[in-house]
Amino acid sequence: MESKFDLEGLKILVVDDSKTIRRTAETLLAKEGCEVFTAVDGFDALSKIADHRPDIIFVDIMMPRLDGYQTCSLIKNNQVFKTTPVIMLSSKDGLFDRARGRLVGSEQYLTKPFTKDELLDAIRSHSSKSDRTAGS
């Protein structure tokens, strides 16, 4: 099995106002050896990003205060974090939502509820992009 070899030690931030989604993702990813941080909304996420410098960020679209599109846009407009992969999470699966996610700079769009394999595949497909943090 290739399970842990490429995920061990990766820092992942999960931003979602749903405690269930945060806990589920945190549990699944921690079992794979990831260091997982969670945030309840975009504002919370911005401070956690600055503090922990995650390798990959999962962001829910529909959140209070600062939604996922706004959060992603702020991340991608920051010189330090613009290359950090952002994967949008949403219960909506419309073409408009996916396109809007791309416009603000997200690398991928996962529809909730997601499976363990979808979550891990998303991380694997973008973790090579975050190897830049290994040397910094």
Go through the PLM ranges and name each one:
Residues 63:
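Receiver (REC) domain active-site loop signature in two-component systems and cognate sites
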Residues 23-31:
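Charged docking surfaces used in two-component/phosphorelay signaling
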Residues 33-40, 48:
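Short hydrophobic/Thr-rich beta-strand motif most characteristic of the beta2 strand and flanking loop
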Residues 114-123:
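C-terminal output helix
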Residues 52-58:
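Active-site beta3 strand of CheY-like receiver
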